[in-house]
């Protein structure tokens, strides 16, 4: 009798509202309830969530919207690619406001009962030395990981595509950053689009970090670019026994 392969269970999946930016948060949550999902990765940007460097807002409203539908927020994802805050901000005022923004994200995640907040390395200026930018990103990750630990959370760090960052864009970059920060509150996360663009596989990530180290991923297909429905792209999802 052949051994059955592991299957992905619906309760393992946290749906994400970034795909519903043109709809209200109520509409998104209604759809997730109807589809039978149980948990949410909350992307924090308007028109769904108000979060900035001055604080977080309407946490009670957000919590009630999920609870009324039998849903829970499992991960919080503060927008930082198209918004003015990023993890490797160089200018002092930008750095100060970015760190404040992400700390408020951690606080909101705690209030909403999340287990994790998803992060990335940010990016250095293209005209500065990469290692100098790397040091700054590492310092900021260390500050935020410590703050996350104080609030009962773990940060999960994904890689980015080369046009999004000149820092962590590969599994080896992610391994280096996480090893150098050396905090139990900073853990790896796989983004399958960045993984596919880098020509990597899930096996590469599991081999780099070991069994049980990866608890979260952005699970999407691509060609290798794009954010496609699973099966519409070409990402390698085969895992050896």
Identify the residue ranges that each predicted region occupies.
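Active-site acidic/histidine proton-transfer and metal-coordination neighborhood
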Residues: 3-6, 27, 68, 85-187, ...
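A generic secondary-structure micro-motif detector
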Residues: 18, 51-52, 95, 134, ...
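Active-site-proximal loop/turn and secondary-structure-junction residues that shape catalytic pockets
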Residues: 19-21, 44-46, 79-82, 121-125, ...
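Glycine-rich, proline-tolerant flexible connector loops at the mouths of alpha/beta enzymes
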Residues: 43-66, 121-128, 228
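Short active-site-adjacent helix-start/loop capping segments
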Residues: 48-51, 74, 82-86
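Glycine-rich, aromatic-flanked loop segments that form ligand/cofactor-binding clefts
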Residues: 66-74
């Amino acid at each position: 009798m052949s051994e059955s392969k592991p299957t992905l269970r619906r309760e393992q999946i946290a749906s994400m509202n970034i795909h519903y930016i043109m709809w209200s948060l109520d509409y998104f949550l209604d759809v997730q309830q109807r589809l039978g999902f149980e948990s949410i990765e909350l992307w924090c940007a308007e028109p769904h969530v108000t979060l900035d460097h001055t604080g977080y807002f309407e946490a009670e409203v957000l919590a009630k919207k999920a609870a009324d539908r039998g849903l829970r927020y499992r991960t919080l994802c503060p927008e930082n690619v198209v918004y003015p805050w990023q993890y490797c901000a160089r200018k002092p005022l930008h750095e100060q406001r970015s760190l404040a923004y992400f700390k408020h994200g951690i606080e909101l995640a705690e209030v909403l009962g999340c287990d994790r907040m998803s992060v990335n390395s940010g990016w250095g200026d293209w005209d500065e030395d990469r290692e100098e930018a790397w040091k700054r990103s590492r310092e900021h990750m260390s500050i935020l990981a410590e703050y996350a630990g104080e609030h009962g959370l773990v940060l999960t760090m994904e890689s980015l595509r080369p046009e999004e960052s000149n820092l962590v864009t590969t599994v080896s970059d992610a391994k280096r950053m996480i090893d150098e920060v050396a905090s139990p509150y900073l853990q790896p996360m796989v983004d399958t689009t960045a993984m596919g663009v880098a020509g990597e596989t899930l096996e590469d990530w599991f081999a780099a970090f070991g069994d049980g180290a990866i608890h979260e991923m952005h699970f999407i297909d691509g060609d290798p670019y794009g954010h496609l429905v699973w099966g519409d792209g070409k990402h390698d999802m085969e895992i050896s026994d």
